[in-house]
């Protein structure tokens, strides 16, 4: 099996899990518990962070493109992300959570963008945060492979993590859950160096 075909299969698996199974769990099991704690009440709503929140998509695409010609790195990273999404989906299936989002008047570009995110991204499947888990896993992976590139991604990842709270898509415990999931996956990264794939 050619490497190009394998890379496409890995990418399609990630897309299928995220756009298919993840969304299915959201629809089938839409109501969950609220994990908000006292700290969350002190975190302000900052609609401007909606732009940063959406940067995780081009970030992931760019990193995949960066490693497209390095099959070993591409394969390991893909398998790690598949594991992240799969574990998160299993958690959502048995422990559904939701965020109580504020009602925001669409008065400018940023509030309209935030409301658009609210419209298309349901307020459940929140613990652990996939935004946090995916971007953190990628940043750690890239930093180990290429420290200079990683040093660019780490600040962006930090801002993306903050954005999940500043636009009220996640609460603090969701962030902790996402970081823990990323840590477990990256700590066991050798598992994903499967030469047969």
Role assignments for model-derived ranges:
Residues 6-14, 75-83, 149-153, 173:
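Alpha-helical transmembrane segments of integral membrane proteins
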Residues 115-197:
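Membrane-embedded catalytic cores of phosphoryl/pyrophosphoryl-handling enzymes
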